[in-house]
Structure formats: structure tokens, C-alpha cells
Amino acid sequence: MKNFRYLNIFTILIVYTILMFYIGWNGWVWLSTVFGWESWGYYAFIVGFISYAYILVQVFKFLPFLRTVGSIWFAVIQYALMLLPLADIAVFFLQFSIEKDTAIIWTGAVTLLVFFFIFAYGVFNAYSPVVRKYDVHIPKKVEGRKSLRIAMASDMHFGKLSGVAHLKRLVHHVNEMEPDIILLPGDIIDDHPGVFIQKNMGPIMKQMKAPLGVYGVLGNHEYYGRAVPEFLQEMDKIDIRILLDEVITIEDDFYLVGRRDKTERDRQSFENLMSTVDKSLPVIAMDHQPFELKQAADAGVDLLLSGHTHRGQMAPNHIVTRRMYELDWGYVQKGAFHAIVSSGFGFWGPPLRLGSRSEIVQVEVTFE
């Protein structure tokens, strides 16, 4: 089994290297044609270094800039593998009507222009959040309360690229909503809380206010950082309660259920968590990954809030997430059960969003 795993890793590295060679070769053909470069050694070193930056940072942890370089390179890879084959085909046909060098120069220039547009538009979408509003009616009676306004933000991935300025946008938009309660269904930080602490983001995040409090759950990236205790400690300092397979009542008006992430195999099921719940009261649940909508509905959850999918983050990845999840983004109602999946406030990897948008969700819940 161990040898099979090594074989898989080796195969992936070989395929990845071939793809990086293809991207690098296209870049060299254009640059050498435009500028007349003949020596490719330095160019090959730079492309190779950038291509493996995300792997190198796992070894050279004292060079955190490599993670940023590697993150941005992921976007370059995706769109290069979409655009460069088209550019190569264009050059092949154009060379029959104009000089090949001219075809290379102009096709490369157009490709770079498309790249610039993709990155400019993607960065704008990533750093310019919108507020999505949903109306949900739960036909249960709550003494002294007819409605509940929820501010929900998932997948902030606070760290290097989703930093202080983006956090301030979150605080501004959330407080502007004047919510009754703030819910954060996972991936609050980007893996390890070190950057969050280093940038002193906690006091800024603490400025988010709601009468009923701020609650969250763990996402897969909190586990990836292997520093869950440190993360929980930071959240506790800023009065954000992280629910770990817990069910609590909010002012005896409704239940709030918070699940551990699917990453933790021993987490409790919805059925177990709901076993002691008085289902005459509304039940709102947070589960980072939206894999178990049916289980939540069968257990008696009224409203499930999730994130994780990013709606693919960079088109056409949304085609994949649409097939992976029953609901990869938006709202669905099935009988008395409601589910909302957010595309997230932040981003993983490159600070780009195409086919999705950085968002905060405002849920207006009404009761009988």
C-alpha cells in the first residue's frame, strides 16, 4: 500500500512536470521571438522555481512568500492550460497566411491580454464582496420572537492573501446588516492560525457584533493546519464560540447545532446530535461541507448552513462542484427543510474568483 502511494505521487509529479514544460515552452517561444533571446537557462530556472514553489514551501517553511507565489501560479496553470492550446492552434493556421514569427507575436499578445482581463476581473470578484439575501420561513412558534436575522460568512481563509483589509470589509458589511446572530460555518483561517495572530486580526474580527453572539464551526482547513487547539484559543479570546459536535439553545428560542468537519471521521451524526432536541422549536445547524443534506433533513434540522465549495472559485470549476454536491451554491427547500450553501467570503490559493463572487449571506428567518 505504501509503495502504491509513492507510485501515485511519482506519477502525479511526472504529469505535472510535463504540463509545466508545456507552459514554459510556450512562454519561451514567445519571449525569444519578441526579444530575440537565445539563452534559456535563467528562464528555465525561474519557471521551474515558480512551478514548484508550493511544494518547496513545505520544506523551506522560513520562506513564506513561496506559498503566495505558488498560490497565484495555480491560477496561471489553470488558464494557461485552457488558453495555450487554442493559441498554438491559431499559430498553426495563421502561419499559412502570414509569417510564423508575426503569428507567434500577435497570438501571444492576445493571449496575454486575455490573461490580464481574467486576472483583473478575478481579483475584483475576490476582493469586492456582495451581500446575498434569502428569506426562510420556519413554521414553528417562538415565544416573543417572530423573526431572526442571520449574518453568515464562510470560507474566509484569513491569512496571507485574505488579510486585514479583507477582514475589515467583512466587519463593515456584517455590522451594517445589524444581525441578531452571526454564524461562521468553517474555514475561518487558511490552515494555520500563525498569520492570523501575527497580523493581529483577532481584535478587528472582535468588532463584529450581534445581540445573540457569534458562533462558528471547524472547516477542513482548520484541520489541515494541525493547530486546532491554538485556533480555538484565538477564537475564544475574541468571543467567537466554536461548536464542536454541540447543540445549544439560544435564549430558549431555538436550537443551534454545530458539527465538526467531515475531515474528522469520528464526528457525531446528525441523528445522534438531534436525539435530545425538542423539535417543536426551530433548529438551525452549521456543517462546513454540504454532503449530508438528506441526513440533516431526516434528523429534523429546519435550516442548514454550509460553505466549502467556493462554487468552484474559478470557472469552469463550478461544473465540477455542481456534480459533486446536491447543492453547491445558493438555496434549496425540500418540504420543511431549508439549506443554504455560500460560495464563501475569501478564497483558497489564488485571490481570484471567476464564475463566483466573494459574498456574505443575510438570512431573514420568520416564525409562526
Stretches found by the model and what they are:
Residues 140-368:
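Soluble catalytic domains of enzymes that build or remodel membrane lipids, polysaccharides, and related
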Residues 66-70, 92-110, 120-154, 159-177:
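N-terminal signal-anchor transmembrane helix
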Residues 1-127:
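Non-catalytic terminal accessory segments
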